[in-house]
Amino acid sequence: MVRHSGFNHSKIMVVDDEVGFAGGFNIGDDYARLWRDTHVRERGPAVWALGQSISIKWNAHHRAGEQMSWRPPDTWDPRITVAANQPPLLVYPIRLSYLDAIQRAQHRILINTPYFIPDQQVLEALLHAARRGVDVQVMVPEDSNHIVADWASRGFFGKMLEAGITILLYRASMIHAKTATVDGIWSTVGSANVDRLSLGFNYESNVVVVDRDFAARMEEIFALDAQRAVRIDTPRWEDRHGLARVVEALLVPLRPLL
């Protein structure tokens, strides 16, 4: 029953059914001034899908007389889709879109996420991609606002480094962006972290774009962020304090909850 509920973690705004916003931004002073985040603004067919994502969540928790009515889209653009989790139906398309893109990757995968606690299938997909020669880079905050999540994510770093994945720790501020690009053509921007809560429990909404120009811009942003990050190398990681290893091991049982 718990998996059928889900927290609403989406960050969407739709104005007059003409323009829509989606991404990682919360509303608050700290988020606006102190955090590094990514949101997208959409016009056109994708706005309808963002509105539907809002109405699905609204209708799931309101009675018939209070529900938003469904209306068909005027048109559609196959380059842009909205993947929206629906926990009551156990529908989690964001996770599937990530897996599909990672498994198709031939050249590079660039992921930015504030909390990296993947399930086994997502982790193995990334490891396998790196082992077959794909340039896999994962950027996370050096110190996020959730210390337990930080320590839990570090428990994956050893396997990732061994497989050849580049791990970047962003130092300039708390980076809260949830983005990915694959092979310079596929991109996603949204509210979903690469963790089990976002990919298999929460209400989340991600915009998925298959467009080279958009992906090029996302890669430029990733490169700029990388200039403010430090790369973890294997010798440095293997030389970490023994207490850190103990904490990482103790948090393994909590991974399904994070």
Give, region by region, the residue ranges found by the protein language model.
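Charged, low-complexity intrinsically disordered terminal segments
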Residues: 1-258
